[in-house]
Amino acid sequence: MSNQLLDRVVAEIADEMAQRADRGEVASYIPELARVDPKAFGLAVIGADGHIAAAGDADVPFSIQSISKVFTLTLALGKAGDRLWRRVGREPSGSAFNSIVQLEHERGIPRNPFINAGAIAVTDLILSGHQPREALGEILRFMQFLAGDSSIAIDEAVAKSEQRTGFRNAALANYMKSFGVLDNPVEYTLGVYFHHCAIAMSCRQLAMAGRFLAHNGQNPSTGLNVVSSERARRINALMLTCGHYDGSGEFAYRVGLPGKSGVGGGILAVAPGRASIAVWAPGLDAAGNSHLGRVALEGLTKRMGWSIFGV
């Protein structure tokens, strides 16, 4: 892969996105997110050799929201291994990210770890045996370690905004608690959940944190194995099939990469063996995924030939 080509493609995509009028709608149900500039756009791509191509607002921190679920899943699998799958499934939901419908049909077991109910169950596992502050500290330190940046922090204003308005998440958690899926007090689990979703990172930091998923579980910056190659492959598989809620099929069809979105407008995408990619554009589509983020990634994979399904 030519670094000059990558630099040019990333710059071209950023210029193209700046001209787009169809930007989607900024999330309004979390008051703090509603204040974000809808014209923001950032893109960062880190190649296998460590070269970084970045453009636009790639160094502006944003609320990663559900992208944090990739990293909490990684932590939970490290703690519990396959025992995790007793409390959460691995199937696409086909429903909105905060839907309670399937929980009713499936006796409190969430479909996958990337919908809200599934991520709450994963958070509960990480919390077990710890105080909420300890569990949250572990998650934050893990993110800082992966990104190689100790300045990464939680946006307390966003976390408090989510706590004040997170009634559906409270309903999901209480419903799972009634089936014994959650071990800890609901308010503790939700507190940790809201706070790790409120971690703020830039595209550059997020792409750095995701590099282990592009390189068989190894962090190329340190040479350390974060997870086994098998586990990295399986996390990527879940990102491909479940990472964009009920828009996961559309994302796979158009982009052709494992990816995880967040309602803050970010997307972390993985080109296995090639690159870790983070894009941010706050305007969302009807499924709650970044509209221009998806468009930008589609352009990137086409021009670089990175779709896992072929050029």
Swiss-Prot record:
It is an enzyme of class 3 (hydrolase). One of its GO terms (molecular function) is glutaminase activity. Its EC number is 3.5.1.2. It catalyses: L-glutamine + H2O = L-glutamate + NH4(+). It holds the Pfam family Glutaminase. Substrate binds at residues 66, 116, 162, 169, 193, 245, 263. Homotetramer. Belongs to the glutaminase family. This is Glutaminase. It comes from Rhodopseudomonas palustris (strain ATCC BAA-98 / CGA009).
